[in-house]
């Protein structure tokens, strides 16, 4: 899980993850972690417009990072991936606008949406969560 996830309660944190993936059981593991963050106060959007593979973060309309690095143990330790750190309000606001457009093609993860998932999907997500150090 993300370090400092309790900050979601105090600060506005919005996360978009793909509703589908190119890797089996990845959405279930992602949903499991997203559900935990949702319970802490983060808004989680499930992107329905296809497979969304971007790794972008915008902070306070002044700073953003864009790149290929996944925030998981394997990528941070072993993979040769990188992100650009951009300190430019104009670029950050353009990315914010793109995010807001993508929100229109997304489903907000709510307790009701979570409850509609089958027990099997929840179990697969739990197992996937246990395996995240190896993914």
Give the ranges of each region predicted by the language model.
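Short, small-residue-biased leader/transition segments that mark boundaries at the very start
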Residues: 2-9
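Glycine-centered short loops/turns at secondary-structure junctions
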Residues: 10-12, 41, 61
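Short internal beta-strands
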Residues: 13-19
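Short, small-residue-enriched loops and turns at beta-alpha junctions
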Residues: 22-25
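Structural recognition of alpha->loop->beta junctions
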Residues: 32-46
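HKD (HxKxxxxD) catalytic microenvironment of the phospholipase D
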Residues: 44-103
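Short, surface-exposed patches at the edges or C-terminal ends of soluble domains, predominantly
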Residues: 110-113
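A transmembrane-helix-recognition feature enriched in membrane-embedded lipid enzymes
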Residues: 116-135
């Amino acid at each position: 899980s993300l370090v400092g996830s309790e900050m979601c309660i105090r600060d506005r944190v919005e996360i978009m993850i793909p509703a589908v993936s190119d890797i089996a059981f990845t959405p279930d593991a992602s949903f499991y972690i997203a559900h935990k963050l949702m319970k802490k106060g983060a808004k989680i959007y499930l992107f329905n417009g296809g497979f969304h593979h971007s790794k972008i973060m915008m902070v306070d309309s002044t700073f953003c990072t864009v790149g290929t690095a996944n925030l998981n143990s394997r990528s941070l330790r072993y993979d040769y991936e990188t992100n650009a750190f951009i300190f430019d309000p104009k670029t950050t606001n353009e990315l914010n606008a793109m995010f807001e457009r993508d929100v229109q093609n997304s489903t907000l993860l709510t307790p009701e949406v979570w409850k509609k998932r089958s027990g099997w999907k929840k179990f697969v997500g739990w197992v996937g969560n246990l395996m995240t150090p190896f993914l």
